[in-house]
Amino acid sequence: MQQSTPYLSFRGIGKTFPGVKALTDISFDCYAGQVHALMGENGAGKSTLLKILSGNYAPTTGSVVINGQEMSFSDTTAALNAGVAIIYQELHLVPEMTVAENIYLGQLPHKGGIVNRSLLNYEAGLQLKHLGMDIDPDTPLKYLAIGQWQMVEIAKALARNAKIIAFDEPTSSLSAREIGNLFRVIRELRKEGRVILYVSHRMEEIFALSDAITVFKDGRYVKTFTDMQQVDHDALVQAMVGRDIGDIYGWQPRSYGEERLRLDAVKALGVRTPISLAVRSGEIVGLFGLVGAGRSELMKGLFGGTQITAGQVYIDQQPIDIRKPSHAIAAGMMLCPEARKAEGIIPVHSVRDNINISARRKHVLGGCVINNSWEENNADQHIRSLNIKTPGAEQLIMNLSGGNQQKAILGRWLSEEMKVILLDEPTRGIDVGAKHEIYNVIYALAAQGVAVLFASSDLPEVLGVADRIVVMREGEIAGELLHEQADERQALSLAMPKVSQAVA
């Protein structure tokens, strides 16, 4: 039952940056003992609101009210001391320090300037036990798995008696087992009467955890759902994108041309058995498989990121020798990698540079001078055509949302003479509206005759977008399914390891 008095309230919150209005008049309430989800497309304002709550940003207008008192935090330390903790996607811990030191960093127990190690490890052990974690507090953090790092971050919040704990995309790097453990902890924190804010694009997580959902769009409050029995996927999507998008995938049958890409008994590092497949001009082929199936390893090998150890790659019936990415690009084969931030973009460069970096060599003046006129026009053209949301072409790409970063990478390859595009988890961590836009780009590329090979662990996405689905299992092809005939049961049956099938 919802309490009558909210523990946390946002009142008319607005935030303006130079040239950008990030938040406008955000007002809603959160209650103790509830998980309150925040949803919206990338750039909707969720992370900005959390940064205001945590003291990273000061609001331009409005106020934050905690337990009836209007609060203003000068920095994150002030917020943490007031009982507000944010568990970010990129964890703020020190790998070289011990678990206990990370938990009590800034408030280490000491006497006469000397840290009381015995008391430190004892207190840290109590916090870890509270979370059900069997970890030696004296262990250096660097030796723990990422899921355990997250538990240390939560223990750090509890050590400061945090009453408000916000999670920002917490499961993006976790295994299924680690996600289950995180959910167990969040439910325990809810039982203890804490306010839990939860930001995620994964609707299955939202429905599994939430007592209330607030939706943002374009920096504005849209709606708060409080009756979880009456809200469904379609209602959330409509609130997030401002329209009923119906079938988000929008697949339609199309005709294909001649064979454009062929793999003849190709092996790459991490791919156990030779892979043979073909993709025709204008065809979209989806690669599906469970973790460890070899999808990403095959993609990296085809692009020259890792070594092809056997077999032959053909483009337009011509054998291609790919030993590094420049060989693939020269042959007309491009890659949007799974690790978008680490391998797909240059974070400290502008959107303009990230779009132009590959094709600029073809447009230099006198063989050595950058053609600024071409670069400006090319970047602006792709920003407009791909609907990249940015204050301008000179904005650092690291400041863009994941969906807009992905569209900038696509813009880079649209600047080249593309025959084949390899897409590895192209919509991971991207909101539903941006996914729809990226699917439309994929369809447009296919309509232009590009052969599309994309790998995804999102089975509904593969079934919804691909003309043909190639299922991989333990580094080999387990089977193929046509779009019109494929369903989740068939695909999962093919993808499951043989041992599991035998046990079943």
Swiss-Prot record:
Pfam families: ABC_tran. InterPro entries: AAA+_ATPase (IPR003593), ABC_carbohydrate_import_ATPase (IPR050107), ABC_transporter-like_ATP-bd (IPR003439), ABC_transporter-like_CS (IPR017871), P-loop_NTPase (IPR027417). One of its GO terms (cellular component) is plasma membrane. ATP binds at G40, E41, N42, G43, A44, G45, K46, S47. Residues 8-243, 256-499 form the ABC transporter domain. It is a peripheral membrane protein. One of its GO terms (molecular function) is ABC-type L-arabinose transporter activity. It comes from the Bacteria. Its main location: membrane. Its EC number is 7.5.2.12. It is found in: Cell inner membrane. It is an enzyme of class 7 (translocase). Transmembrane segments: none annotated. Keywords: ATP-binding, Cell inner membrane, Cell membrane, Membrane, Nucleotide-binding, Repeat, Sugar transport, Translocase, Transport. It catalyses: L-arabinose(out) + ATP + H2O = L-arabinose(in) + ADP + phosphate + H(+). Gene3D superfamilies: P-loop containing nucleotide triphosphate hydrolases. Belongs to the ABC transporter superfamily. Arabinose importer (TC 3.A.1.2.2) family. The complex is composed of two ATP-binding proteins (AraG), two transmembrane proteins (AraH) and a solute-binding protein (AraF). Part of the ABC transporter complex AraFGH involved in arabinose import. Responsible for energy coupling to the transport system. This is Arabinose import ATP-binding protein AraG. It comes from Shigella flexneri.
